[in-house]
Amino acid sequence: MASFFNLTLDTLAPQGVAVKINNGAIYTANKVVNLAISCSDADTTGYSMKIYGSVVGAAKVDDAKWETYSTTKQITLTDGDGLKTVYVIVRDAVWNESTAASATITLNTSIPVVTIVGPDVSIISEIAGKNASKFNFTADQVFDEYKVGIVPAQNSSQSDCVVIGTTGGSSNTSGSDGNYPSSENIETTIIGSDFKTAAGGADGTYIVKVFVKNQAGTWSA
């Protein structure tokens, strides 16, 4: 029988711990998000982790429970729109703990509201001098994209919108430059020939609606 044995001392905490929320997204409209967790240690056998912060049921580190280390984890953010911070601590098999890694994301569950002023005229033709209708619109929050088009009903969603083109001279019927301020007053001009194309070529009265998409990816109703 052997009269000796090997005993390993390991006091090194897990290295290179990092976390991303929804692949590094800045905004989310959904409280349920996906975490991507990483650790640079070559072998993570026996590792565990704690997740806390703006997390339902785990506001503080002591509220969180140790669970088996995983590179992916779905969590639910706490109620209330605003900046959310999630922390992750990784512990090795002999309970050396890493420093907390963190990531942030802004929760925005609100639906943008669009306000239209105008139009200056409610009937147009294709004849110069009578072929243009102008209006202005604003949104109640910062938005990244907008579109103006014909919809079948007043309560139609953006997926039903036939965007009015700009071939005939219409302007500001769509945009995707991003970060449009909520205070920005956008003037849109609809030209008769473009309106006719969007309408399928037939005369008649049509519903024109403006949609904006906020930075969380939610379109106005």
What kind of feature is each model-predicted range?
Residues M1-A221:
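Low-complexity, disordered linker/stalk regions enriched in Pro/Thr/Ser/Gly
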